[in-house]
Amino acid sequence: MRISRKWLPWGQLAATCAMRAQHVGAAPNCADLTRPGLFPNTIVQTAAVVAADAKTGMPAYCEVTALITPVVGSKITAVYRLPESWNGRMLGLGGGGWAGILNLLQPAAISGPFRAASPGLTRGYATAQTDGGHSSTFVTDASWTRNNPVAVTDFSHRAIHEMTVLGKQVVASHYGRAATKNYYQACSTGGRMGMMETQRYPDDYDGVVAGAPVYSLLVQSSSVVRDQIFKAPGAAISIEQIKLVHDTVLSACDAKDGLKDGVVTDPRRCDWEPKSLQCKSGVADSSCLTPSQVNAVNKAYQTVRTRTGVVGNYGLTRGSEAGWNPFVSTTPGPRNVLNGDLGDIVPLMFGDSGFDPATFDIEKQQAAIHRTVFAAEYEANSTDLSKFFNRGGKLLLWHGLDDPAPSPFATLDYYERTVKANGGESVRFFALPGVYHCGGGPGADSFDPLTALEQWVEHGAAPETMVATNRAAGIERPVCAWPKLPYYRSGDPSKAGSFVCR
């Protein structure tokens, strides 16, 4: 999954949140948390105070590392950071990719879908993270899944639940009282984990932010379908041609929101056709597209379904082309784990370690993928959130409209099905124009859904708009509750107030 350096404007909120923090005075001895038998099925490996750092703005906190073993063979590592100045809440954080990386603290190290704990700590949250039940060098490594059903279950849902249950116990033991509210926030795989919490473990959290969630194996099947599209004879297109397509799309559709700013606000309203770039007879260079290339780009935009209506691939959005690589390999070359090479999860998805994803046929195999044992553990597709919602839980979904990995339309589909099943009082979906996977892109990608979630859960103020920024571009945009999107009205185009949600 894509690693982004942008997501939330945490720093500007630190001062405000510090004022709200409940100063608990002299906290219990951090090392006391290592006492044997204090927590069931758990070995607390370390517990030590980390001093405040004036340079980074990090507060002093107690850092606890624990090994959780709920079943035989399970090895879930979790880390908890308990600030001296606590705001009375706990914040669960999810992983990215295939997880396996745990000790994420500073935003400069890794951010976006693998959001570090430091933003929550600076706001006074006790934070919780897990490696998902296994250790990896890279989040794209899925080798740990080989003949390891316990680890697969841990990664799919058990690890994040066990992390949360123990986290509540650690918080109560350290501070002498339970957290008043428990929130969760993550993107990508972490978004899926958050959705899984609302579906399987509805008592864990009071509110969940799930960004660009990889909640279905559609992400994997789509990567194969897209690879097949551009691996067809004569279909591959160069980086220069991708830029040509992108620039032409912007020329046709950028201004439909009232402002030319390099972003197609609503890709559904963009009716540009690739055939307009087809080369004249006898011409074949980067200034145009051959018929085979036109066909490939057309297919990339199209949602593909089986005859019975099962989606095998949601189309890429017009305007997202500049962000296709590395998730969509349009040029000749080997596959990788992001764009069609399923590697170690082939036997989990297809039941055959020798299956060649290049031969994948949506009509023959798509429905079967969702019936596998792996899908039953991994997919967070249930819309029965009655237990979560009935206890006051709130779900805030968001997705970048230019995301070339998990499709924003998949998240929209889940949102609409959830509203149909439960009503729309306790769920919101926010689409971010021009934003890639969990961040990046020409759109405004840095915003604060956690504060909106807090206000919703604690004060009943359902979010309708937020403000997002793109610091590099120096712009602000409203983030609008679906089905609304931001349209330019008048005034300074760099300010959110110059736009209206409609």
Protein language model annotation of sequence segments:
Residues 2-11:
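Bacterial N-terminal signal peptides that target proteins for export
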Residues 11-20:
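Bacterial N-terminal signal peptides
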Residues 23-89, 101-107, 114-115, 246, ...:
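Catalytic-loop region of hydrolases
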Residues 97-176, 222-223, 230, 354-377, ...:
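Cap/lid segment of the alpha/beta-hydrolase catalytic domain
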Residues 186-190, 194:
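Gly/Ala-rich beta-loop-alpha elbow adjacent to hydrolase catalytic centers
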Residues 196-198, 203-305, 431, 451:
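A catalytic-pocket lid/entrance helix-loop region that shapes and gates access to the active site
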Residues 397-399:
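Short beta-strand/loop motif that positions the catalytic acidic residue
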Residues 405-409:
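Conserved alpha/beta-hydrolase "acid-adjacent" motif
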